[in-house]
Regions:
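Acidic/His/Gly-enriched intrinsically disordered linker/tail segments
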Residues: 353-449, 453, 470-471
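Juxtacatalytic substrate-recognition/specificity segment
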Residues: 169, 215-386
Length: 563
């Protein structure tokens, strides 16, 4: 496979990509003027690019001269030496169709061929890209413009670098449909130009027969693009026209406080796609192709989001008969908040069992993390997604009665009893949902190691300042490790290798648990004591969570959880 062939070949960094495309029915003519840099430790005798294999490269030019090149499916070898730390500007001309077969080559065959959609009875088939007069949707997965880093590394999935590139897109389009991409758009006749103020990991192109609704709140533009005749939502939110800006502001502020990150883009877009548009949860990436910088692609009528506004309103009216009525404004605000929560939750429910969950493919919180930074480490390729997960996910370590059905978190714990994190990232048989739970456990362990020596608040403040000052950049892990040691005196090198390579977990014995109620100055406090023994050959970190619950019966009572 071509991706494997070039996986270990040194690659240049893509600094600038000025793209010009002309859609021509099922074909596309394009020109990319790119600036690349050799940040490797040695000179290179050739430059590697990737492009959809159905797009034919007609020429590669530099300073007005044609450069020799060879094509190997999606790979392009350009015979141009580049010295260490040297920057070069090249122009690549290409033309042709878009092959969807290049998409998701790392996904297991059984998942690739599975046409089921959770909680949806019908099967719609799968599409990964469109290029036609009626509809166009191109994402980085289909490599519709030249890049220097492959979208996947099948042999080592977590060893995929990320470029943050200054993109400009010019679309020459004679039709009457809406052209949508990242950045600020400028229309000059049949030429639409999109300019971005930040370096991005990738961009998309959509051309569709859309209607649009837009609202500006503070400094952010909120836009909804939906197929004509598909406005099923306005009647629920039009009564909120006066209060909606305040509701949106509150939701945005709440998300930023919860995630301790500011929304980094100037606009937020919901764009409807055909229901067949499919993507996959890949833990090494941390987000799906539904979630692009600035843009969330929503399958037709929001069918995969499980948001039926009319059914929700009927339930509210039914509940109102028992607990007091909600007026129309309260109902509409509740509908809006429920919809937003479906876009910010880590998991989506699959059936009635609360432990039977799927990774939420429409979770937009990676816009605050995965689209803004990348931590690179050849030794620990999983460190980027682990740190992002540590910052992005909420704690769910609380006490829960076990109903006799093993859940994915317990399966992850069982896996780690005899496997290392290093082994897990190469285990293609490990379900994504189990690996996600394993990733959360390992991310929590990394966080606990640090916060056993400093407060969580101090660590959160450090992380926010560290990543905000390096926004839209590739950051070497050594830089993060150095800054943590400089700021707090914590040596991650004393912990990280065992965290990554240990092939078993510690054995912890807990006994003599005793809880006492103490009244001090009319305040009731609790003192909890227990003994811990670790007879194993691996250090362990104990974290405790104290919960206060109700009375007897089968109701949830007080409890503790240990890690």
């Amino acid at each position: 496979m071509t991706f494997d062939k070039y996986a270990d070949v040194p690659h240049v960094d893509l600094l600038v990509n000025d793209i010009s495309v002309t859609p021509q029915g099922h074909r596309l003519a394009g020109k990319s003027t790119v600036k690349v840099a050799n940040n490797n430790a040695k000179p290179l005798d050739k430059i590697i690019f990737y492009l959809n294999p159905e797009l034919t490269v007609t020429s590669v030019e530099m300073a007005g001269k044609n450069l020799p090149f060879r094509r190997d499916h999606q790979g392009i070898e350009v015979d141009q030496p580049i010295q260490q730390q040297e920057e070069l500007t090249l122009t690549i001309n290409y033309e042709g169709k878009i092959s969807e077969n290049i998409c998701y080559t790392d996904v297991l065959t059984e998942d690739y061929l599975d046409t089921k959609v959770p909680q949806v009875f019908w099967r719609f088939g799968k599409r990964y890209a469109w290029l036609s007069n009626t509809f166009t949707l191109l994402t980085p997965e289909c490599i519709w413009y030249p890049v220097t880093i492959a979208p996947v590394n099948p042999g080592a999935p977590y060893n995929v670098r990320k470029n943050f590139t200054d993109y400009t897109l010019t679309v020459h389009y004679e039709g009457d449909k809406t052209v949508l991409s990242q950045g600020k758009s400028k229309i000059d006749g049949s030429v639409i130009t999109f300019t971005n103020t930040s370096a991005l990991p990738g961009i998309s192109l959509t051309i569709a027969d859309y209607d649009k609704k837009a609202l500006r709140v503070d400094s952010t533009d909120y836009e909804i693009y939906y197929f004509k005749g598909h406005d099923y939502f306005s009647k629920y939110f039009e009564p909120l026209s006066d209060t909606l800006p305040g509701v949106i502001r509150e939701v945005k502020n709440s998300l930023e406080i919860e995630k301790d990150r500011d929304y980094p883009f100037g606009k937020f877009v919901l764009a409807e796609t055909p229901v067949q548009f499919a993507t996959y949860a890949r833990n090494w990436k941390g987000y799906t192709e539904y979630v692009m910088p600035e843009i969330l692609f929503v399958p037709e009528r929001g069918i995969s989001l499980g948001q039926d506004f009319e059914a929700e309103r009927r339930r509210m009216n039914e509940w109102g008969r028992h607990g007091g009525p909600m007026d129309e404004t309260e109902q509409n605000i509740s509908l809006f908040n429920r919809f937003v929560s479906s876009l910010t939750s880590e998991n989506s429910q699959n059936g009635w069992n609360p432990d039977n969950k799927l990774i939420n493919k429409s979770n937009i919180t990676p816009m605050l993390f995965g689209h803004t930074n990348y931590i690179s480490s050849p030794e620990y390729p999983v460190i980027d997604i682990a740190v992002n997960n540590m910052m992005n996910t909420s704690s769910d370590q609380g006490f829960r009665f076990w109903g006799g059905i093993i859940n994915d978190k317990q399966r992850a714990n069982l896996y780690l009893e005899s496997h290392s994190f290093e082994t897990a990232i190469g285990d293609t048989e490990l379900k994504p949902e189990i690996f996600y739970e394993l990733l959360k456990l390992k991310s929590a362990a990394l966080n606990n190691y640090i916060t056993s020596q400093i407060t969580q608040e101090d660590f959160n403040k450090f992380l926010k300042a560290f990543f905000t000052s390096r926004q839209f950049q590739n950051i070497p892990f050594d830089t993060l490790r150095y800054e943590i040691e400089k700021r707090f005196g914590i040596r991650l090198s004393d912990f990280i290798d065992t965290w990554y390579t240990a092939s078993h977990t510690p054995t912890i014995y807990i006994k003599d648990v005793d809880a006492n109620q103490i009244v001090l100055d009319e305040f009731t406090k609790y003192q909890i004591k227990f003994k811990v023994n670790n007879p194993s050959d691996i250090d362990a970190i104990i974290s405790t969570e104290v919960m206060q619950g109700g009375g007897g019966g089968m109701r949830r009572g007080g409890g503790m959880s240990f890690e």
